[in-house]
Amino acid sequence: MAKEELIEMQGKVDEILPDSRFRVTLDNGHILVAYTGGKMRKNHIRILAGDKVTVEMSPYDLAKGRIIFRHIEASSSRPFKPAKRFAR
């Protein structure tokens, strides 16, 4: 499938599910299950319930998607705290 065929939508994470999946409600009200994209997983980007995200979906299955971006809100109530790194 070509990358041009994918649909990008904005949404909000409602619930964190097992196996690094998330229940996301899109701006149009549609609910789907999404997983984090590879680059987000590689860079250890954390997604919490209530975060605004961009979801990429296939036009053939609109019930599943991939989270490709987490939007940072300027007036966020939770401060940014980097993850602790332990020497191995």
Curated annotation (Swiss-Prot):
Keywords per UniProt: Cytoplasm, Initiation factor, Protein biosynthesis, RNA-binding, rRNA-binding
Localization annotation: Cytoplasm
UniProt keyword annotation of Translocase present: no
InterPro entries, sorted: NA-bd_OB-fold (IPR012340), RNA-binding_domain_S1_IF1 (IPR006196), TIF_IF1 (IPR004368)
Taxonomic superkingdom: Bacteria
Listed CDD domains: S1_IF1 (cd04451)
A molecular function GO annotation: rRNA binding
Role played: One of the essential components for the initiation of protein synthesis. Stabilizes the binding of IF-2 and IF-3 on the 30S subunit to which N-formylmethionyl-tRNA(fMet) subsequently binds. Helps modulate mRNA selection, yielding the 30S pre-initiation complex (PIC). Upon addition of the 50S ribosomal subunit IF-1, IF-2 and IF-3 are released leaving the mature 70S translation initiation complex.
Subunit structure as annotated in this protein's UniProt entry: Component of the 30S ribosomal translation pre-initiation complex which assembles on the 30S ribosome in the order IF-2 and IF-3, IF-1 and N-formylmethionyl-tRNA(fMet); mRNA recruitment can occur at any time during PIC assembly.
Name of the protein in its database record: Translation initiation factor IF-1 2
Species of origin: Methylobacillus flagellatus (strain ATCC 51484 / DSM 6875 / VKM B-1610 / KT)
